[in-house]
UniProtKB/Swiss-Prot annotation:
Induction trigger: Expression is regulated by the atfB, srrA, AP-1, and msnA transcription regulators. These factors bind respectively to the conserved motifs CRE1 (5'-TGACATAA-3'), SRRA (5'-T/GNT/CAAGCCNNG/AA/GC/ANT/C-3'), AP-1 (5'-TGAGTAC-3') and STRE (5'-CCCCT-3'), present in the promoter of aflB.
Location of region: Enoyl reductase (ER) domain: 437-682
This protein's encoding gene: aflB
Species of provenance: Aspergillus parasiticus (strain ATCC 56775 / NRRL 5862 / SRRC 143 / SU-1)
Entry keyword Metal-binding: no
Protein name: Fatty acid synthase beta subunit aflB
Positions of region (Dehydratase (DH) domain): 990-1478
SUPFAM superfamilies per record: FabD/lysophospholipase-like, Inosine monophosphate dehydrogenase (IMPDH), Thioesterase/thiol ester dehydrase-isomerase
InterPro entries: Ac_transferase_dom_sf, Acyl_transferase_dom, Acyl_Trfase/lysoPLipase, Aldolase_TIM, FAS1-like_DH_region, Fas1/AflB-like, Fas1/AflB-like_central, FAS_meander
Annotated region described as Acetyltransferase (AT) domain, given as residue ranges: 23-395
Keywords: Hydrolase, Lyase, Multifunctional enzyme, NAD, NADP, Oxidoreductase, Phosphoprotein, Transferase
Job description of the protein: Fatty acid synthase beta subunit; part of the gene cluster that mediates the biosynthesis of aflatoxins, a group of polyketide-derived furanocoumarins, and part of the most toxic and carcinogenic compounds among the known mycotoxins. The four major aflatoxins produced by A.parasiticus are aflatoxin B1 (AFB1), aflatoxin B2 (AFB2), aflatoxin G1 (AFG1) and aflatoxin G2 (AFG2). Within the aflatoxin pathway, the fungal fatty acid synthase aflA/aflB provides the hexanoyl starter unit to the acyl-carrier protein (ACP) domain of the norsolorinic acid synthase to allow the first step of the pathway.
Known catalytic reactions: acetyl-CoA + n malonyl-CoA + 2n NADPH + 4n H(+) = a long-chain-acyl-CoA + n CoA + n CO2 + 2n NADP(+); holo-[ACP] + acetyl-CoA = acetyl-[ACP] + CoA; holo-[ACP] + malonyl-CoA = malonyl-[ACP] + CoA; a (3R)-hydroxyacyl-[ACP] = a (2E)-enoyl-[ACP] + H2O
SMART domains in the record: PKS_AT
Family that this chain belongs to: Belongs to the fungal fatty acid synthetase subunit beta family.
Length: 1888
């Protein structure tokens, strides 16, 4: 229960005291609240105890006595009616189910209402008489009338208690007797359970039914009662609560029968009925039993009256004490009119027998406020029934505790708020006024977008010129250029105060998308497109948001077709509360496309929700045609016929009615057919779904939606095919039906339809395409696409179709058909002459397919015939069917009965003449409105429109106004509501015409014939802190207006940013002086002229010199300083910037500004070192912007947008650093045509000490319809392309290219790779078509290592090509040298999303970036330029994103960014919340490619997208050595990676051809033996190759063979190894090296190999590293070298019969022995083992200090080393074991180790791991004797000229020294010191 306010500030009470409010007290009755009635009393008692004590005493005593009376005691035993005890001790009260029975709930409900009334009086400190004096009337719902009658007779507190005692007695006896009179229930347990299971509640005597109309409920009752038979079982309609809420009463078992019936007729919850006609839908019904056990308001309680009166013989009510109207619940009559003896019987019957009609009661209340005292849902019912009538319903029974009488004075009265009125205009004439006239400035009648009528711009212009709102139908446009051109034509033809609204179809997503794009650009250019209407669907919230926020429209309308769609529009309006949303309702009776909905029902149900959105403009249409039929919809009176209050619409739209207007392009024959149609009324239109109704019928359109059209002969065929053919959804069954009925359908097409059957032969017989000759096809095409009697094509595209078929003939028969002509007859003659007898051949099958393809082309208007009865028959039949109504001449026989004419079944009755202009039609309607309103007595007083619409300035407390005789100041403080500019401007300029009024109140200005938004008005839009200063003449005329704004530096200073002045009242000068701290202060002057026409004054801008003045402003702002040179510089000039030094202070300032906007996690990020890559725009700013100033570039810099910018470091150069001295030059790369303007691309080159370092490219978009230069051009540096000439065909193709000029034509191309470095230059015609293409550049022979040699050049020039011939060729046969390789799983492992806000102000960035463009820092300037306010510098947004990416990758010295390219896609406004997302998306040439995006968190619009090429963290590539080989290694990559497979294949081929074995076979199978045969010629070559290999040192001057036993006479040689050949050194080494190089190739193919990275190899891995990362040896030579090395090592030592040596290798980890056991200890142990045993062993590899070493030696020594290491690991201090103790440990193991055979494999120890497959002591002194032969072998194969130091210096880390390779003397000394190489010794002597 809510407390009642004590405040006498109660608005309703005050109003009632003044007589300004009429308050009605309403009381509730029985219902679901029965179960909680005692709980309600208890809560009220807890809150108001003392105030209610006297009333509760009266009630408790009265009810207790009555309950103990003889007539009641049987019912009330054993609980009695001890109310006081129940309230003080609730647990002793009966259960809520017992209390809900009528004998108790009835008096308790009455008491609850009276108690709340009593508490209200106490809170207001009024006695009941005083309170009653403020009431206008009273009533009650059902038993609530008892409480109502009690308060009407109360004069004081005593009389109030007396009245309460009396009505409680009446209530007690009614409840008791009703309970006793209730027929006994025959409901079974099954019935009860059934209702519970169906969610209908516990079976009772009253059933709530909602969702049906009253007539539907009565039909349900009639049906059920027929089945019940006897009347004593019937169900009755007891209560009519609202239009769709009812309560039925009767025996529970009978109500169960109602439930059964309702279940059968109602719709399931998930049933979709949207495509079912409203009349045929199942209703959505809710039924619920109420906890009421007596059938109140039914004849079943007819005897209660007498019994109650008998019990009340001592009670009486004095009629004379009822001082206020008391309304009967069934009739609504005033009970004051009754005689005294009639009152009690009337009250009893009103509760027990009489049907309750609550809507009737509420309609007669005549109240402004209703106080609902409950209990129950009375309040919601009253609110529902009185909504829109101005009645405020205040509920006093809510749990939340409102101030019940503190509500507003009155609720909205829809009729008063939205109804049509007459107001006086400035001349005193009567003028229509409502929300549409206020919001759109047009009369409340409009013409809807409708194809084909409003597709025509001239028709739309005629409506606009008549002064009415109209929509251009975008559905009739299929090309962007045509759509744009027609809008521009329309813009020139409409009045200055009229905007353009385009009607778009959301059902065509592609068309919708490009039309939105066109409109967006047109708005940006100032074309007055003010709104769009979206039909055929409601877009997604994201699409709507885009339309609302980014286009610049004033309003968007939607055409919902259902309840759900209406709610979608309401949600859109709530999402965008400050944007005007139109809701156009046409429902199912409209002409053309329509829904399945009833016209009135959905609006009746949603009107209140619609009107809760003040930004919705509600327009109604369909079925209208004149004034009398539309007038009730504008006043709202139409709703009264349905029992609702007035529901006015804001406007009426006409569609079908306008098709017969004089200006409409509808053919005369079609107009006559429309006029002849009779039409029908609202009750019958739905019949058109089944049959012609009033001359109109519904068919299914090409979109599958119902559409109303005239029932012509052709349309009736359409209807028939809808039913017979198109309703068959199974394609195969439909085709079968078409085959079976082909002859009938074809005949009907030819006889009745606008699209005839195409395939007709020369004899007039219907055939198929396959049966026609080429000449017959040609003739038929001409007949059906050309209007011969008017000598024109039906559509120009059909001529293209015909010529394409002629081209097909030319290609088919290889004959010349030159200049076929313009006219069909000429074409036929020329084709026939050229083809001769071939013309009479039947079509080839492939030509039939080609012909069908031609018929289906999207760039051709859909063909006007049916080519086939195939699966596309419905498309052929229905597509593009509306145009014939405007071109009957193009129809066969000009037969209007064949065509498709849109019309509505109701609207058609109003079309009675084809000689009315649009102006006459619309004016006549509006004139009727004026006459009807003038005749209405309520509208005799005509108000002043200005006095009604204009708000006082006092409504805006934040506006401080100071005026005197010479000056007016209007200052917008930093708090308070934003002033409405129209209100403010009206106060400034007054109502009289003047130059100032024209400047401030005109919505548009004219410039060069174009209408644009008024920039002065936009600039003057006040922001917080702004002041408008108005200076007056001595005659109080305005002479000057100034806008004074804060400087934006954070201080308190302000300056004049805009000054408007006129000395003669005709010429106006507007001076913009953006508040930028430069000296001298920059400013620009705009000149205007006030054109004083009789009816209106308009503002026209003088455009002469305008562009030059703006350029001069920007020269000053950007400090370009070359105004005199700009006239002599041209588009091909080179521009230079000043030489400058990059200083620490500049970089620090730049970074400080960026840090201010950084999110919290980046505040401490402060990288040092290189210059931020985007600081390059600051360096290059002067050079980048100077090209914008050249005089030959025609542009308005106010329309300049920074579209994109990129920074690219030159290859291998070091990034810029502080201290660098740089100079920049630039040139224009492109001035290119874009659909909505011109794109200017400028490239700047930053040089450091004469070396090119960075290229900066910037795209500037220049909006507007005028081209920026006479000859647009593009200069493009094409990507480097590589073509591999890998076939004879490709060689021949290259030879044939005339544009490829070779330096040496004799040089064979086959096998070469050619690198192309080209530039393209394109010149364009003004229409954007290519006029000249020139491609030039160099061609190089390209080797895999990246080296190039000159090969030739390219020169191509053409004036007639449609694309870039050269680049197309290279893309077809080649590929870019550096390819972007997308990652399979792009993403980011760290923080990938960062939230950041745009800067609050941009002055700081403007200062550090040198970009003082005022649109970023001056709000007034930004608004003048057409923006909503300042926008953040695009480069600041870029820098913020770059900084986040820099932080994410950890680029602490800013050295890793190699390029940054950002596209700026939407403006960022100050303080916009942004979300930056980072993703690693690709690799390119070893660099990471990051995708960085920024989104506006508020709108989810992407504002910028950047690609960054970033070097990886410093990377080294390390290749492992021998010992890791295993069978099958590398084969996964071989299978899955083409590059790896190619390398394996290349090596396999080489080794097979040169050495006779397959390395793939060895790796895949690891055979124990392999025999190479030398018998064939190839075998002998292989044997010779082996013999040329040097083995041991020469004996007697001759080298022994490397393969022992091999001679010139050997016929074969067998390699064998017991563990498999892959484990033998000679094969393991090439296999391992090959696998590693293949892996590296795979990495290169993924683009992940870092350029310039360091590399090293472990032992054998060094060869793989050099092979993968350097190029001094070819791949094949390297493989041969590694194979030789393996053979050399394999045979360096003696082997036993099994091929084994006595040697091996072992890895040791000293740290596993003990913490103190380190490198020295291990070396000592190894030395002692060799010294004591004589077995060779050495530490040969030093891998990880104190953790990993490799020892080589005799297997026994290695075995012993492993065992001793195990022993030492058990010692508590192994590092202390020295000398003698170690020797003892050695000798301990000698006996055992001497017994170990060579075949035994060493086992893994605690600190040692044997290396399997290695039986050579690599890197040991034992192999020193092999050095010299190996050195000689290498010297023969490695040529000094092939070594490229750049590949090795600083990158290669050799094993021998562990330091990066160098050619410095110090490095040579280091290597010599380690190796003692004699050659290095000699080199050092030379370097001395």
């Amino acid at each position: 229960m809510g407390s009642v306010s004590r405040e006498h500030e109660s608005i309703p009470i005050q109003a009632a005291q003044r007589g300004a409010a009429r308050i009605c007290a309403a009381f509730g009755g029985q219902g679901s609240n029965n179960l909680d009635v005692l709980k309600g009393l208890l809560e009220l008692y807890k809150r108001y105890g003392p105030d209610l004590d006297e009333l509760l005493d009266v009630a408790s005593n009265t009810l207790s006595q009555l309950a103990s009376s003889p007539a009641a005691i049987d019912v009330h035993e054993p609980w009695g009616f001890d109310l006081r005890q129940w309230l003080t001790t609730p647990e002793v009260a009966p259960s809520k189910e017992i209390l809900a029975l009528p004998p108790r709930s009835f008096p308790l409900n009455t008491l609850l209402s009276l108690a709340l009334y009593c508490a209200t009086c106490r809170e207001l400190e009024l006695d009941p008489g005083q309170f009653r004096s403020l009431l206008h009337s009273s009533t009650g719902h059902s038993q609530g009338i008892l409480a109502a009658v009690a308060i009407t007779q109360a004069e004081s507190w005593p009389t109030f208690y007396d009245a309460c005692r009396t009505v409680l007695q009446i209530s007690f006896w009614i409840g008791l007797e009703a309970y006793l009179f209730t027929p006994s229930s025959a409901a079974s347990d099954a019935m009860i359970q059934d209702c519970i299971e169906h969610g209908e509640g516990l079976l009772s005597s009253m059933l709530s039914v909602s969702g049906l109309s009253r007539s539907q409920v009565e039909r349900v009752i009639e049906h059920v009662n027929k089945g019940l038979g006897e009347c004593n079982r019937w169900v009755h309609l007891a209560l009519v609560n609202s239009h769709e809420k009812f309560v039925l009463a009767g025996p529970p078992q009978s109500l169960w029968a109602v439930c059964l019936h309702v279940r059968r007729i109602r719709a399931d919850n998930d049933l979709d009925q949207s495509r079912i006609l409203f009349r045929n839908r199942k209703p959505i019904v809710d039924i619920l039993f109420l906890p009421i056990s007596a059938p109140f308001h039914t004849p079943y309680l007819d005897g209660v009256q007498d019994r109650v009166i008998e019990a009340l013989s001592s009670a009486s009510l004095a009629l004379h004490s009822i001082k206020i109207p008391l309304y009967h619940t069934g009739t609504g009559s005033n009970l004051q009119e009754l005689q005294p003896h009639q009152l009690i019987p009337t009250l009893i019957r009103a509760i027990t027998v009489d049907q309750l009609d609550w809507p009737l009661v509420c309609r007669g209340l005549n109240a402004t406020h209703v106080l609902d005292f409950g209990p129950g849902q009375t309040c919601s019912l009253i609110q529902e029934l009185t909504q829109g009538t101005g009645v405020s319903v205040i509920q006093l029974t809510t749990q939340s505790g409102p101030k019940p009488v503190g509500g507003h004075l009155a609720a909205v009265n829809w009729e008063a708020e939205f109804g049509l009125r007459l107001h006086a205009n400035v001349h005193g004439a009567a003028k229509l006024h409502n929300r549409m006239t206020t919001l759109l400035g047009k009369p409340p009648v409009m013409v809807a977008g409708m194809t084909p009528t409003t597709v025509r711009w001239d028709f739309v212009a005629a409506v606009a010129q008549a002064g009415y709102h109209v929509e251009l139908a975008g559905g009739g446009y299929h090309a962007e250029r045509q759509f744009e051109a027609e809008i521009r034509r329309l813009a020139t033809a409409i009045p200055a105060d009229h905007g353009i609204t385009c009607n778009l179809l959301y059902a065509k997503p592609t068309t919708f998308s490009w039309q939105i794009s066109v409109i967006k650009d047109l708005v940006r250019q100032g074309v007055p497109v003010e709104g769009i209407t979206i039909g055929a669907g409601i877009p997604s919230p994201e699409v709507v948001q885009e339309c609302v926020q980014s286009i610049g429209l004033k309003h968007i309308s939607f055409k919902p077709g259902s309840f759900e769609a209406i709610h979608q529009v309401i949600q859109i309006a709530r999402t965008h509360p400050n944007f005007l949303i139109g809701l156009q309702w046409t429902a199912g009776r409209g002409g053309g496309h329509h829904s399945w909905e009833d016209f009135h029902g959905p609006i009746l149900a949603t009107y209140a929700q619609i009107r809760s959105c003040p930004n919705i403009l509600l327009v109604v249409g369909s079925g209208f045609g004149g004034g009398p039929d539309t007038f009730p919809y504008l006043t709202g009176q139409w709703a009264q016929a349905f029992g609702y209050p007035c529901m006015p619409f804001d406007g009426v739209l006409l569609g079908s009615r306008m098709m017969v207007a004089r200006e409409a392009h509808t053919s005369a024959q079609a107009k006559r057919l429309i006029i002849d149609a009779q039409g029908v009324g609202d009750a019958d239109w739905h019949k058109s779904f089944d049959e012609p109704t009033g001359g109109v019928v519904t068919v299914n359109s090409e979109f599958g939606q119902p559409i109303h059209v005239l029932a012509t002969r052709g349309v009736m065929l359409w209807k028939e095919l809808d039913n017979r053919v198109f309703s068959i959804k199974d394609t195969s069954k439909r085709l079968e039906y078409l085959r079976n009925h082909r002859q009938e359908i074809v005949s009907r097409l030819n006889a009745d339809f606008a699209r005839p059957w195409f395939a007709v032969d020369g004899h007039g017989q219907n055939v198929e395409l396959e049966d026609m000759t080429y000449l017959e096809v040609l003739r038929r095409l001409c007949d059906l696409t050309y209007v011969s009697h008017q000598k024109r094509w039906v559509d120009p595209s059909y001529r293209i179709l015909l010529l394409d078929f002629v081209h097909l003939l030319r290609e088919r028969f290889q004959c010349a058909i030159d200049n076929p002509g313009e006219y069909p007859l000429d074409i036929i003659v020329r084709v026939e002459e050229s083809l001769k007898d071939k013309a009479y051949r039947t079509l080839y099958p492939e030509d039939v397919s080609l012909l069908m393809h031609l018929f289906s082309r999207r760039d051709i208007k859909p063909v006007p015939f049916i080519p086939r009865l195939d699966e596309r028959f419905e498309t052929w039949f229905k597509k593009d069917s509306l145009w014939q109504s405007e071109d009957v001449e193009a129809v066969i026989g000009q037969d209007v009965q064949r065509i498709f004419i849109i019309q509505g079944p109701m609207a058609v009755q109003y079309s009675i003449s084809d000689d009315e202009s649009v102006k006459d039609i619309l004016h006549n309607i509006c004139n009727h409105y004026v006459e009807a309103l003038q005749a209405d007595s309520r509208e005799t007083s005509i108000g002043d429109v200005h006095s009604i619409t204009q708000k006082p300035l006092s409504a805006f407390p934040g506006l401080k106004v100071t005026t005197n005789r010479v000056q007016g100041l209007y200052k917008f403080e930093k708090v308070g509501a934003v002033p409405e500019m129209d209100v403010l401007f009206e106060h400034i300029v007054g109502l009289s015409k003047s130059w100032a009024r024209t400047c401030l109140m005109s919505k548009s200005v004219f410039r060069d014939g174009s209408r644009l938004h008024n920039p002065i008005r936009a600039a003057l839009q006040l922001q917080r802190g702004d002041t408008i200063e108005v200076l007056l003449t001595a005659d109080s005329e305005i002479r000057k207006i100034r806008l004074i704004s804060p400087t934006g530096d954070g201080g308190s200073t302000s300056k004049v940013v805009l000054e408007i002045v006129s000395n003669d009242g005709q010429r106006v000068f507007a001076t913009l002086a953006p508040n930028i701290p430069l000296s001298p202060e920059p400013s620009v002057v705009f000149c205007f002229k006030v054109d004083q026409k009789p009816n209106e004054w308009t503002l026209e801008e003088d455009a002469s010199g305008r562009a030059e003045r703006i350029k001069a402003l920007y020269m000053s702002l950007w400090n370009l300083g070359f105004p005199n040179k700009a006239s002599v510089l041209g588009l091909n000039s080179q521009f230079t910037g000043e030489e400058l030094m990059i200083t620490t202070d500049k970089i620090r300032d730049f970074e400080r500004v960026l840090r201010q906007t950084s999110p919290l996690q980046l505040q401490s990020w402060n990288p040092q070192g290189c210059v931020p890559i985007d600081y390059c725009v600051v360096i290059a700013w002067s050079a980048l912007t100077k090209p914008l100033m050249v005089s030959s570039l025609k542009c308005d810099l106010l329309d300049l947008l920074h579209s994109a910018i990129s920074f690219h470091y030159a290859p291998s150069v070091k990034p810029l650093r502080v201290g660098d001295i740089v100079k920049t030059s630039s040139r224009i790369l492109a001035v290119s045509v874009r659909p909505r303007g011109t794109m200017l691309t400028v490239s700047a080159d930053i040089q450091r000490q004469g070396q090119h370092v960075v290229t900066v490219k910037s795209d500037f978009f220049l909006g507007g319809p005028v081209l920026a230069c006479e000859t647009p051009f593009e200069l493009t540096e094409e990507p480097e392309m590589v073509v591999h000439v890998d076939s004879e065909v490709r060689r021949a193709i290259l030879h044939s290219r005339k544009w490829l000029m070779r330096e040496d034509r004799a040089l064979d191309l086959l096998g070469r790779q050619l690198l192309f470095r080209l530039k393209s230059e394109k010149l364009f015609r003004p229409d954007g078509q290519l006029a000249l293409l020139q491609v030039t550049g160099s061609v190089f022979s390209y080797s895999p290592d990246g080296s190039t040699t000159a090969f030739g050049r390219v020169y191509f020039e053409s004036e007639s090509c449609t694309g870039n011939v050269v680049m197309d060729f290279l893309h077809r046969y080649g590929a870019p040298r550096a390819q972007l390789l997308e990652l399979q799983h792009p993403g980011w492992t760290g923080t990938s999303t960062v939230a950041v806000r745009g800067p609050r102000r941009s002055q700081s960035y403007a200062r550090v970036s040198l970009d003082h463009n005022p649109i970023h820092v001056c709000p007034a300037f930004a608004r003048y330029a057409g923006l909503s306010g300042p926008i953040v510098h695009g480069m600041e947004t870029s820098a913020m994103m770059r900084r986040i990416a820099e932080w994410a990758i950890g680029d602490a010295d800013r050295s890793r960014f190699r390029s940054w390219h950002i596209t700026l896609q939407a403006p960022v406004h100050p303080n916009d919340p942004l979300r930056v997302e980072l993703q690693h998306k690709a690799m390119e040439d070893g660099e990471m490619v990051l995708k960085v995006q920024a989104f506006n968190e508020r709108t989810e619009e992407r504002v910028a997208e950047a690609d960054a090429h970033v070097e990886q963290e410093t990377t080294a590539y390390v290749f492992c050595g021998q010992g890791s080989q295993r069978q099958g290694m590398g084969m996964d990559l071989y299978v899955n990676c083409p590059e790896a497979k190619a390398l394996w294949a290349r090596a396999d081929k080489h080794l097979w051809e040169k050495y006779g074995f397959s390395i793939l076979h060895i790796v895949q199978n690891n055979p124990p033996a392999l025999t190479v045969h030398f018998g064939s010629q190839r075998g002998r070559r292989i044997r010779a190759n082996y013999l040329r290999m040097m083995g041991q040192p020469p004996i007697d001057g001759r080298h022994p063979p490397i393969l022992k036993g091999l001679t010139r006479n050997s016929t074969s040689y067998t390699f064998s190894y017991s563990q498999g050949l892959l484990m033998s050194t000679q094969f393991a080494q090439p296999a391992l090296a090959l696998m590693e190089m293949a892996q590296f190739e795979w990495l290169k193919a993924q683009g992940v190999v870092q350029k310039g990275a360091r590399f090293a190899g472990h032992s054998l891995g060094e060869y793989a590293a050099l092979g993968a990362c350097a190029s001094f040896l070819s791949f094949e030579d390297l493989i041969s070298l590694i194979f030789y090395r393996g053979l050399k090592m394999q045979n360096a030592l003696p082997r036993d019969a099994n091929g084994h040596t006595d040697y091996g290798m072992l890895a040791a980890d000293p740290s596993r022995i003990g913490k103190g056991f380190e490198e020295a200890s291990l070396k000592c142990l190894v030395h002692i083992i060799q010294q004591e045993t004589g077995w060779f062993v050495e530490v040969v590899n030093y891998n990880i200090n104190s953790q990993q070493y490799v020892c080589a030696g005799h297997f026994r020594a290695l075995w012993m080393l492993g065992k001793i290491c195990d022993d030492l690991s058990c010692h508590p201090q192994p590092e202390t074991v020295e000398g003698q103790e170690l020797r003892a440990m050695v000798w301990k193991h000698v006996p055992t180790v001497e017994q170990v055979p060579r075949e035994d494999r060493m086992e893994r120890g605690r600190a040692t791991i044997p290396l399997p497959g290695i039986d050579i002591p690599y890197h040991s002194t034992m192999l020193r004797g092999e050095i010299e032969p190996y050195r000689e072998y290498l010297s023969e194969r490695i040529k000094v000229g092939d070594v490229k130091p750049c590949e090795l210096v600083g990158r290669w880390i050799p094993n021998v020294v562990g330091q990066p390779f160098s050619v410095d003397k110090s490095y040579v000394q280091l290597v010599h010191g380690i190796t003692g190489s004699p050659r290095l010794h000699s080199l050092l002597q030379q370097m001395a």
